[in-house]
């Protein structure tokens, strides 16, 4: 860890006492900052509150008083807090810098950074690359949006390690000097319009991952979307991946995977299910090769890696019915991949937070959907979608209720699929919690 001096004696406001806010506050305190933590909820009964106040850190919960901005030189914002918060808007008029904690991770780390973002596939790719590193000479440390606070992991990472960092658009909006040696963008489609306001703002946020890169760095990019790069001043070397074309990078030719002209593995030896996952595999191979991982470690991983929890996860088979948990599908593209993975009659559980999106992108993916079980804020939109396509549907209270109601309709040889196409935050704190509710109820059948 680099012991930087820039925060010594500076007044820093940490917005949000979640996992990242807690670790950020402790780090800034150790770096000599005068730290105040603010959360919109009453946090006075939490263990984090007790620990931070015992350290001498001020913690204010329940509201966001504008007086907190007096003499503040920096705000470290929880990525989920919108920029429309009045405190943030006032800070912007005062030209107070606003960052997310991944910027702090970059400032203190001695490690190389491999940053991964994208609308879909980023968690799978991050996990896959992490597994490829496990047998490698140097450590690949997972952090960021995948659940391990980046600034905490960075404190213990050495100069020969690599931070394999999953990055959301929310996190990338709050970077200033952050520079990954290898940046990987899986794809960019419509998402998070409630947060970003419009599609262009969302694309711009994703492309932030490239803004400080130089000609010494790499950008791994989906060949299907290469025209997006025309609107940005990309200084890094671009390496493409494609399932359809021979490209400068990772590609498939006659069911064999290549990196440039080097053979890596036969497609038949890759165990990760789903045609869409071939793009994730190619992106991961490109990153691993650029990071210096040997082919044997890459191939060993691809022959054993079956996927991640809550992403097309097989839960169980009961009375001839197979149950799949795809709670991580928080947008229509991810759900289209899930629906396309099955040909059997499918009972589809869908719904959640209304981000302003429609569901018309799923029009061509639902021929085999036998029944829909709809819950959450998007109930009205999804019932209209079901009616338009003449799909029988049942309105449910939540995921647990939806699983219970499938029993009235499902038959042997069919599939029950939770693939919500929506974020979870209207009813569940995370997609993981939503998925666990599904799993728990399925196991009671």
From Swiss-Prot:
Q: Which GO terms describe its cellular component?
A: cytoplasm
Q: Give the UniProt keywords, A-Z.
A: ATP-binding, Cell cycle, Cell division, Cell shape, Cell wall biogenesis/degradation, Cytoplasm, Ligase, Nucleotide-binding, Peptidoglycan synthesis
Task: List the pathway annotation.
Answer: Cell wall biogenesis; peptidoglycan biosynthesis
Broadest EC class? Answer: ligase
Any idea which positions bind ATP? 118-124
InterPro entries in the cross-refs:
Mur-like_cat_sf, Mur_ligase_C, Mur_ligase_C_dom_sf, Mur_ligase_cen, MurD
Query: What is a single molecular function from GO for this protein?
Result: UDP-N-acetylmuramoylalanine-D-glutamate ligase activity
EC number per UniProt: 6.3.2.9
Q: Where in the cell is it found?
A: Cytoplasm
The reactions it catalyses are:
UDP-N-acetyl-alpha-D-muramoyl-L-alanine + D-glutamate + ATP = UDP-N-acetyl-alpha-D-muramoyl-L-alanyl-D-glutamate + ADP + phosphate + H(+)
The GO annotation for biological process reads: cell division; cell wall organization; peptidoglycan biosynthetic process; regulation of cell shape
Q: Which Pfam families does the record cross-reference, listed alphabetically?
A: Mur_ligase_C (PF02875), Mur_ligase_M (PF08245), MurD-like_N (PF21799)
Q: What is its main location?
A: cytoplasm
**Cysteine pairings via disulfide bonds:** none
Q: What does this protein do?
A: Cell wall formation. Catalyzes the addition of glutamate to the nucleotide precursor UDP-N-acetylmuramoyl-L-alanine (UMA).
User: HAMAP family, per this entry?
Assistant: MurD
Q: Do you know which PANTHER family this protein is assigned to?
A: UDP-N-ACETYLMURAMOYLALANINE--D-GLUTAMATE LIGASE
Please give the family membership noted in the entry.
Answer: Belongs to the MurCDEF family.
Q: Which NCBIfam families match?
A: murD (TIGR01087)
Instruction: Kindly provide the name given to this protein in its UniProt entry.
Output: UDP-N-acetylmuramoylalanine--D-glutamate ligase
Identify the species of origin. Answer: Macrococcus caseolyticus (strain JCSC5402) (Macrococcoides caseolyticum)
